[in-house]
Amino acid sequence: MKALTARQQEVFDLIRDHISQTGMPPTRAEIAQRLGFRSPNAAEEHLKALARKGVIEIVSGASRGIRLLQEEEEGLPLVGRVAAGEPLLAQQHIEGHYQVDPSLFKPNADFLLRVSGMSMKDIGIMDGDLLAVHKTQDVRNGQVVVARIDDEVTVKRLKKQGNKVELLPENSEFKPIVVDLRQQSFTIEGLAVGVIRNGDWL
């Protein structure tokens, strides 16, 4: 892959962040508006440059016809420390990519999350491990999830009842996190589907 200019990197980051937040790429008009271009045509020129450099594919005839190629080549993105209020898969959180077959996990893994702390050690999730995560909000009680409470991201076992959510640790030294859905912001970022021990698998 050829190196990107600062402006091209900005466009690429916007596309990736938009996909992670909404599930679809932005239109040319949205790119122009977000980055202060005078017209969608200016955004189109940057997209053509990104396509020439092999990081995106432009699908003709569709206003959102942009496909990222980089992740497919590089493997699963590894998410490190997440800044408050930002999308989990925002470009600045991605430490690198691992060549891991997503289909080794059931359901397929969409990204890896670096585990911080020992609150889940009793089920073999240790500090520094890479947690394979399937991006979904369709989860059930008893499953281990990646959750965001207000602006904090955590890995815990889910127990939801009415307007109350308990996020249960798997370590007796830690207390459950209790969330009142009427007062706190709560989002499921994904379902834990496997563990890679301390980055041994590259």
From Swiss-Prot:
Q: Which InterPro entries match?
A: LexA, LexA-like, LexA/Signal_pep-like_sf, LexA_DNA-bd_dom, LexA_repressor, Peptidase_S24_LexA, Peptidase_S24_S26A/B/C, WH-like_DNA-bd_sf
Cite the active-site annotation.
119, 156
Q: Give the Gene Ontology MF terms in alphabetical order.
A: DNA binding; DNA-binding transcription repressor activity; identical protein binding; sequence-specific DNA binding; serine-type endopeptidase activity; transcription cis-regulatory region binding
CDD domains the UniProt entry points to: S24_LexA-like (cd06529)
Listed Gene3D superfamilies: Umud Fragment, subunit A, Winged helix-like DNA-binding domain superfamily/Winged helix DNA-binding domain
Q: What class of enzyme is it?
A: hydrolase
What residue range is the signal peptide? none
- EC number(s) of the enzyme? 3.4.21.88
The ranges the UniProt entry gives for DNA binding are 28-48
Taken from the record, one Pfam family name reads Peptidase_S24
Null mutant phenotype reads: Cells are filamented, accumulate DNA double-strand breaks, have viability defects at 10 ng/ml ciprofoxacin. Synthetically lethal in combination with a priB deletion.
- Name the domain of life: Bacteria
Keywords, A to Z, come to: Autocatalytic cleavage, DNA damage, DNA repair, DNA replication, DNA-binding, Hydrolase, Repressor, SOS response, Transcription, Transcription regulation
| Assembly with partners or alone | Homodimer.
Q: Which PANTHER family match?
A: LEXA REPRESSOR (PTHR33516), LEXA REPRESSOR-RELATED (PTHR33516:SF2)
- This one is known as LexA repressor
Supply the source organism for this entry. Answer: Escherichia coli (strain K12)
Lineage, highest ranks first: Bacteria, Pseudomonadati, Pseudomonadota, Gammaproteobacteria, Enterobacterales
